[in-house]
């Protein structure tokens, strides 16, 4: 990762940021008690801030809106609040024009996202989630890029039934979306059982500590006793306050040498520092990563996280709360496009941010400890852990767990496995599923079911390192296809790679339908970001381990032009690469594309530097 070292000037801290020259940071705000801070932010707030303040701790008009059976929708304002409850209101864009022509309401439905810290569920929970999918969500589950499940296509009249079923699995959807700390990811490396256990526990502890305390979720969705008038005088959010956070906040826990959680793409991260016996001795804390941006607005950009410092195990939770509450108090509540933690750090500087975090923890952070990542992909097939348990990673294209006509029967097959499995299931940040903690004596039974249902233990090197967001037809932000388009593109590129003898070369490729970056395309060696129907920006040059951003190589490339654009680069890579050199590193060294040091210079020196 590229380090940024602030320098002192007579007028205060400044940073030499590649591409934009030296600049001065803003002076951080004076810390206020949260109630005073809310009052101080009363002027000039973004609309969402007023919504949160007036919502009665996230109740709004949701309960009443569910009773309006004449429409499949809820109000626009409640559509913002319902995100905090773990769902988005969507419609089927494939039939939107047809329904408009017939003067019909849009085909509204809801995407529901679960909160599953670390992505681990039991076989019993899996079977309940499977039943929800077949009953309410079109017989499909989707493993997300952040280690949880999503249901698509749940209609309004089935929302409460779905939530009750989720609750019966001892799971929930609280804070899976919205301006809060969202689902906390954790390393899934099956070979490091001891470290994984500690990482998973930290993820769960952070999730519980930073969880909103409002009773609104249980009241609205499970018919819990409703407080008269919404909230009562005694109800508080001790960490968040009425305005919660300025924007989404994402936390991950990584265990080197694998970076499958993409730690540098998140607001807050903890990197396990291991001794020679793979025991966790503490955590490096990372801050300020994030993928989203807006096309054509150079003051928005993706950013890789900085390493803030080192904490002992007993201080990790304090550090998590301190980082989040500094963002709560310093983040931009007037412009949501610049509200993420990455912009807060760019405004005030890493040194000032670190000082405030240390103040809230009550002690200095240690110097960062050395660590090494070797990639951000999964390990497919069987892996034996330190404890003698066995783990089978299955490749699930775009995380879509459903039965495919003439192909793998993911939903049915994993249901059968859950009926006999004695361990647990783990979701990965790459949208795959691990059948975990299998006793040696059960491997043959699991293998037989995997074969019977055609489940995939792997695929080509390119497919194994690919990801796509949902995009069309359900995502309201999508500008282009992603999940439905990527398989065809991969087939084209596989042919090209094979022609150049690169069929076994791991290259990360990710696609998103818009620049919000849900599949983290800006830290993928090849990134496709939707611009319009069948048009994409093509990004190249990210690091294979996810530690360096890519650079815009070609604008508005049509779907039919992508293979032809990449083929000469593959040819050059096959001919001129150095031993062990990854594709993202090669295109920079060979002079095809400029290197991005970090977010502020992401939009500088774009385009091809020379012909391929």
UniProtKB/Swiss-Prot annotation:
Enzyme type, top EC level: oxidoreductase
GO cellular component terms, semicolon-separated? sulfite reductase complex (NADPH)
Give the residue ranges for region: Disordered: 1-26
Q: Which coenzyme or cofactor does it need?
A: siroheme; [4Fe-4S] cluster
Protein name per UniProt? Sulfite reductase [NADPH] hemoprotein beta-component
Quote the subunit structure annotation: Alpha(8)-beta(8). The alpha component is a flavoprotein, the beta component is a hemoprotein.
A Pfam family of this chain:
NIR_SIR_ferr
Q: Which PANTHER family match?
A: SULFITE REDUCTASE [NADPH] SUBUNIT BETA (PTHR11493:SF47), SULFITE REDUCTASE [NADPH] SUBUNIT BETA-RELATED (PTHR11493)
What are the protein's UniProt keywords? 4Fe-4S, Amino-acid biosynthesis, Cysteine biosynthesis, Heme, Iron, Iron-sulfur, Metal-binding, NADP, Oxidoreductase
Instruction: Paste the cofactor note.
Output: Binds 1 siroheme per subunit. Binds 1 [4Fe-4S] cluster per subunit.
Q: Which family does it belong to?
A: Belongs to the nitrite and sulfite reductase 4Fe-4S domain family.
One of the entry's Gene Ontology molecular-function terms is:
heme binding
Task: Give the top-rank taxon of the lineage listed in the UniProt record for this protein.
Answer: Bacteria
Binding-site residues, siroheme = 518
Which positions bind [4Fe-4S] cluster? 469, 475, 514, 518
Question: Catalytic activity annotated for this protein?
Answer: hydrogen sulfide + 3 NADP(+) + 3 H2O = sulfite + 3 NADPH + 4 H(+)
Q: Under which pathway is this protein filed?
A: Sulfur metabolism; hydrogen sulfide biosynthesis; hydrogen sulfide from sulfite (NADPH route): step 1/1
């Amino acid at each position: 990762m590229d380090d940024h070292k602030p320098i002192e000037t007579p007028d205060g801290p400044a940073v030499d940021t590649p591409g934009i020259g030296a600049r001065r940071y803003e002076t951080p705000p004076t810390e206020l008690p949260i109630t005073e801070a809310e009052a101080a932010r009363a002027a000039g707030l973004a609309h969402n801030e007023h919504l949160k303040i007036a919502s009665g701790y996230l109740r709004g008009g949701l309960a009443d809106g569910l009773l309006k059976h004449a429409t499949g929708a809820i109000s626009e304002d409640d559509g913002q609040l319902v995100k905090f409850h773990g769902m988005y209101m969507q419609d089927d864009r494939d039939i939107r024009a047809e329904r408009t022509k017939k003067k019909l309401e849009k085909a509204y439905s809801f995407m529901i996202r679960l909160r599953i810290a670390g992505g681990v569920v039991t076989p019993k929970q899996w079977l309940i989630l499977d039943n929800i999918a077949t009953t309410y969500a079109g017989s499909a589950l989707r493993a997300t890029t952040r280690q949880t499940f999503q249901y698509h296509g749940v209609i309004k009249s089935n929302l409460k039934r779905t939530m009750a079923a989720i609750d019966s699995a001892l799971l929930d959807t609280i804070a899976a979306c919205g301006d809060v700390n969202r689902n906390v990811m954790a390393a899934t490396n099956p070979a490091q059982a001891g470290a994984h256990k500690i990482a998973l526990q930290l993820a769960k502890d952070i999730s519980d500590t930073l969880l909103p305390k409002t009773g609104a979720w249980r009241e609205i969705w499970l018919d819990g006793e409703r407080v008269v008038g919404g909230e009562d005088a005694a109800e508080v959010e001790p960490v968040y306050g009425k305005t919660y956070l300025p924007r989404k906040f994402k936390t991950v826990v990584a265990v080197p040498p694998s970076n499958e959680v993409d730690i540098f793409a998140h607001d807050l991260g903890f990197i396990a520092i291991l001794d020679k016996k793979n025991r966790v001795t503490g955590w490096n804390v990372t801050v300020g990563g994030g993928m989203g941006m807006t096309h054509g607005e150079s003051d928005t950009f993706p950013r890789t996280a900085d390493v803030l410092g080192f904490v002992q195990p007993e201080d990790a939770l304090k550090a998590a709360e301190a980082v989040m509450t500094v963002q709560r108090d310093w983040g931009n509540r007037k412009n949501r496009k610049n509200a993420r933690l990455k912009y807060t750090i760019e405004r005030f500087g890493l040194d000032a941010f670190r000082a405030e975090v240390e103040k809230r923890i009550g002690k200095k952070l240690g110097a960062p400890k050395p660590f090494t990542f070797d990639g951000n992909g999964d390990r497919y097939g069987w892996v034996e852990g330190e404890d003698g348990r066995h783990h089978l990673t299955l490749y699930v294209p775009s995380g879509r767990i459903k039965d495919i006509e003439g192909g793998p029967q993911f939903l049915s097959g994993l249901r059968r496995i859950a009926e006999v499995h004695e361990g647990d299931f783990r979701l990965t940040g790459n949208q795959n599923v691990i059948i975990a903690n299998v006793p040696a004596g059960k491997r043959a039974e699991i293998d037989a079911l995997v074969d019977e249902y055609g489940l995939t233990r792997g695929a080509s090197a390119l497919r194994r390192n690919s990801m796509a967001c949902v995009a069309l037809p359900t995502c309201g932000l999508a500008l282009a296809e992603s999940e439905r388009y990527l398989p065809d593109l991969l087939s084209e590129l596989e042919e090209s790679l094979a022609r150049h003898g690169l069929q076994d070369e791991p290259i990360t490729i990710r696609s998103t339908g818009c620049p919000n970056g849900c599949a983290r395309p800006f830290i993928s060696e090849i990134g496709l970001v939707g611009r319009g129907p069948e048009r994409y920006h093509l990004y190249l040059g990210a690091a294979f381990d996810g530690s360096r951003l890519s650079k815009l190589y070609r604008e508005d490339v049509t779907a039919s032009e992508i293979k032809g654009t990449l083929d000469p680069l593959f040819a050059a890579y096959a001919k001129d690469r150095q031993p062990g050199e990854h594709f993202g590193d090669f295109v920079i060294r060979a002079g095809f594309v400029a290197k991005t040091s970090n977010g502020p210079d992401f939009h500088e020196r774009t385009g091809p530097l020379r012909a391929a």
